[in-house]
Amino acid sequence: MIHLPPAALEAHVAILGKTGSGKTYRAKGYVEDLLREGRRVVILDPTDAWWGLRSNAAGDGPGFPITVFGGSHADVPINEHAGEALGELLGREPINAIISLDGMGRGEMHRFAERFLEALYRVNQQPVYLILDEADEFAPQSGERGTERLLGATDRIVRRGRKKGFRVWMISQRPAVLNKNVLTQANTLIAMRLPASQDRKAIEAWIKGQADEAQAGRAAR
């Protein structure tokens, strides 16, 4: 695994790649590095993919000190109405957390997330790495009806959150459907296999904002 330099960790990061490309494996490796260094991490996990961080690699002993809220491996069960209270709690307390939204309907997940992100932004004042797995769920490009408030909450954290301690990592298998105003705020982008031309164009657009047009075209091929 390629190790990120320290400067890259102090920035917003996008990790992009199709299903099976290894993006989640790589992202977990980077998050493990953060936890080893004592950084505070909060993970929004729509698919219950991250709970294993609390176990060791063999699965027979303790791993990292991280609390799982929600999902089938929950330390603390949650429902769609818990978003604001949990956001306030994690904004006040130095707790590492995985928030599994698996088992919620899509509308329930969106309602939970919008209130959680609003409360976390309002209360938090300390450094925290906010990991958005399947980030296009929280910042959709399409402007899907009913997601306006959620997109606004995500966009506000990404654009304005650095002064309040936020470092946001966005993980997505479809950068084409991840909101471009949010994606362009990433300072570091890690792109893995992306066979769809629309997804490669999204990468090219990001690179154009960071480099010259010739470099962007070469990198997106």
Predicted regions and their residues:
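Hydrophobic positions on the alpha1 helix immediately C-terminal to the Walker A/P-loop
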Residues: 26
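Conserved ATP-driven motor cores of ASCE-family P-loop NTPases powering translocation/secretion/packaging/pilus
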Residues: 19-21, 31-32, 54-59, 80, ...
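Conserved ATPase-coupling elements of RecA-like P-loop NTPase cores
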Residues: 53-54, 105-111, 124, 136-152, ...
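Loop/turn-to-beta-strand initiation segments
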Residues: 38-42, 94-97, 123-129, 164-169
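Conserved H-loop
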Residues: 46, 133, 166, 173-174
